[in-house]
A protein has these predicted regions:
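Vicinal oxygen chelate
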Residues: 1-15, 23-24, 30-125, 132-135
Length: 135
């Protein structure tokens, strides 16, 4: 029997107000590969999904704010997010244009940074912020 690949030691887990739309955006904008999706049979929400961009795996689900202290909320419900992604690419301009065409909001246009090479900053339709960088 083949050994199952271990999960990463640390992976971001996103809460989204519309996880299906977020999955579609990440596929179109960042060529994310969907590894798996579990639909909650009680409510039809995406209870867990796994995606991969390059060598990074990350998770997402629909928000569940109604579950009290165990609840998870989307950036839309919280009025923002406390962190952002750093995505390293070969062509910042092309990656930025592709993400904007897929529905991202451009927060900072592509610029040259002394410490980080070329970079831009985007907000995806789910409210998560991304820095797209060449370094």
């Amino acid at each position: 029997m083949p050994k199952q690949k271990a999960r990463p030691s640390l992976a971001p887990y996103l809460s989204c107000s519309n996880a299906a739309a977020a999955l579609d955006f990440y596929r179109r904008a960042f060529d994310a590969a969907e590894v798996m999706r579990w639909i909650d049979p009680d409510n039809g929400k995406i209870g867990h999904a796994e995606l991969r961009i390059g060598d990074c795996r990350f998770y997402l689900a629909d928000e569940y704010p109604q579950t009290g202290e165990l609840g998870v909320c989307s950036p839309a419900s919280l009025g923002g997010s406390s962190f952002h992604f750093w995505l390293t690419v070969d062509d910042v301009e092309a990656a930025t244009d592709k993400a904007v065409a897929a529905g991202a909001t451009l927060l900072r246009p592509v610029e040259q940074s002394a410490q980080d090479g070329r970079r831009s900053r985007l907000r995806d339709p789910a409210g998560h912020v991304w820095t797209v960088s060449s370094h």
